[in-house]
Structures are given as C-alpha cells and as structure tokens.
From Swiss-Prot:
Gene Ontology MF terms: serine-type carboxypeptidase activity
Primary localization class, coarse: secreted
Residues bearing attached sugar chains per UniProt: 104, 306, 345, 377
Protein name: Serine carboxypeptidase-like 15
Job description of the protein: Probable carboxypeptidase.
N-terminal signal peptide: 1-24
Organism of this sequence: Arabidopsis thaliana (Mouse-ear cress)
Amino acid sequence: MASWIFKLLLLLQCVLVLIQHADSSSIIRYLPGFEGPLPFELETGYIGVGQKEEDQLFYYFIKSENNPEEDPLLVWLTGGPGCSSFSGLVYENGPLAFKVETYNGSVPTLVSTTYSWTKVANIIYLDQPVGTGFSYSRNPFADIPSDTGSVKRVNEFVRKWLAKHPEYFSNPFYVTGNSYSGKVIPAIVQEISNGNYICCKPQINLQGYVIGNPVAYYDHDKDFRIPFAHGVALISDELFESLKASCGGSYSVVDPLNTECLKLIEDYDKCVSGIYEELILKSKCEHTSPDCYTYRYLLSEYWADNETVRRALKVVKGSKGTWERCDYRVLSNQDIKSSIPFHINNSIRGYRSLVISGDHDMTIPFLGTQAWIRSLNYSITEKWRPWMILDQVAGYTKTYANKMTLATVKGGGHTLEYKPEENSVLFKRWISGQPL
C-alpha cells in the first residue's frame, strides 16, 4: 500500500512539472555568487527527448568569446554515469570556477577562469543521462537509462537543439567529454554520422571528438591498474611478479578457484588503499575538510541546491530534489561493452579524434589507453615526442594516420581539472589544426 502511495505522489509531482514546462531556453546575465554581469553569453534550458519527449535534458550553452559565428560547436558530456556537466563547466574547461573557501552558509563565490575552452569554441554542457544534474523525466516509471539509450538521446538532443539554433548548423561540430562518457562518445559520433548519411537534413557539420582518460572496455582498463601501480613504485617488484605469475595479467575478472591470485589482489588492494586514484599525487582525505582537494566539489552542491540559484538558472520548480555533482543512483545499463568498434568505424569515415590521458591517473591508466589504441593497428604518422609549453615538457604525443592523436598530460589526473591550463593549450592547438 505504501509503495502505491509513493508512486502516486511521484506521478502527481510529474503532472505538476508537466503543466509548468515545455521545451524552453533562457539567456542568463547574472548568477548568484558571481559579482556583476557575466562576461560571456550563457543560455540554459531543456530539450525533450525520447518517447513523447518525456526525458527533459538540461543544458548550459556558452558562446565562444572569440568568433561564435564560425568557431567550433562542442557538446560536453561528463562521465559517471550520473555526473553533471556543470562539473565540467566549473572544474575542468569552463569560464567559471568556485573560489575554494570554507562554506559559511551563503552562496559560494564564483570567479572567472583563464583557461576556458570557450575562448575558442561554443560549448553545450549537457546533463545526461536523464536524472543527472537538473535533467529529469516526466515519467516516474521510465526505464533505467542505458548506454545505447544515451547515444540515441544525445543525438536527438543535438538535432533538436540545432533546429532551435539554426545559426550553428554550419559550425564544425565535435562531441567531447571524459571518463565514462569516453566509452559512449564514439558511439554518439557514429549515430550522428549515420543520421547525416541516412535521414536528417540539414546535416550536422560533424568533424570529430575529444575524449579525456576515457573508459574503453572496463575489464581491459582495470587490468592496467596493477602494472601502473608497479611502474610508479606503489607496489613491490616481488608482489608484481607474483601477481603476473598467478593471475596471468588478468586482474579484473579472476577465476574464483584461483585463490592464490585472489589473495595477491587483496595484498595489492592493501598497498594502494591510501592512494587517491584519480590523481595519485593528491592526498586521499575526507572531502568535508576544507583542506582536502575534493572539498571544492561540495561547493557546487551547496550552490546548485540554493533556491536563488535555481531561479536564476530557470530550473523547473519541483523537477529536482537534492542536486548532486555525481549522482551514482542514476543507474545505467552499461550495454556498450567496448568503444573500439566505434573508433574503427569513425576513423574509416574520416573523423578527427583527440585522446587525452593524464599520466598520474590510476582509475583509467595511460597504459591501458595506449594498449587499446595500439590494438586499432593504425599506422603512425608522427612518432612519440614531447609537447611543450614555454620550453617545458607538458606531456607526450603521438599521431596516427587515421586522424587520431594521443596526448598525455604530465602530472595530469583522471579529469582536466588537475591541469586546466595545460589541457586548454592542448585543446586550442588541436582544434585549430596546429601541431601540439
């Protein structure tokens, strides 16, 4: 009985939201926490996708500060699944960031950045899959999101967004993102490309994609954590050699009868339990402490949960409870097991791709990224070399015949935020066709 009452209440809430809202967009000139008018053009809104447009995907669109009529148009997808694109906007490559200071109960302070990709590109920061950030579903009984469902919905979103903003149809278009979205993005590129070939006019001026520390195939990616840990002196030679001998190089899917391998993996887990895997150089600490690096993530949650902020962003009232930067309750059917077939298809069609890898990320180690790129068997057009900023090594790069570029970021982590200036230089060079 109680469960039916709960479902009825959910249904009533959705009816109220439905009454309030259809596809909408608003120009935002001021944001709580930022002093004065915004120094860039921001639009927020919803686009309905899926059956009867039940899924309302929320976005932040920021015009290029250079030449928006001609500069590339990007859609940015944060990983998770379940992490809001607002995380990319304020922590990775957007024109705003939070001033890191102890929360005092007021609206957290926003400041301008120097490294935003919007210096040279128009960017749509998209909250997806549904349930992420401020996106929501009108149907409380909707199916659990899936990788393949996300592919179709992002494609639908992009086409509908461009129909409402036809002045951007001719701009070079790229799909961008990091972490888990790196597994889905190549499939989205293929879906958009298929639409261009098969059905949809006007065509999207699709040029390629950018993925940072991307998931390619989870079991494959995880298998490289132990070799990475050994390479950076987190585990001993003896433990590493024993793991190789007992587990045969497969550490993520282990035969339950192989007790020796399982015991050695337990020993490995103990060795690295105090390591912050997203950037092994950072301290692993309690995120509620202002001295902890991840404390800054709380500021976005305090900010987005403020009612004044929601009104400023034109968030539909009643559509979202507590906002979370990464809501891992947004379950997803991970039905794309590997991105590799999509990379192959996209390269055959001539799309450019940039794969960025922070070299101190143990979540998706650069060793695994290099391995799956090697498996594509692309010929090399430019051998491994350092790329530089002001005569200093910022990372290493290699270019392939099929328009794929791999670039590591020295001292970088799982996302762009750990080296935002270096990642900005890297992106600006690549997107303009300059050598890295």
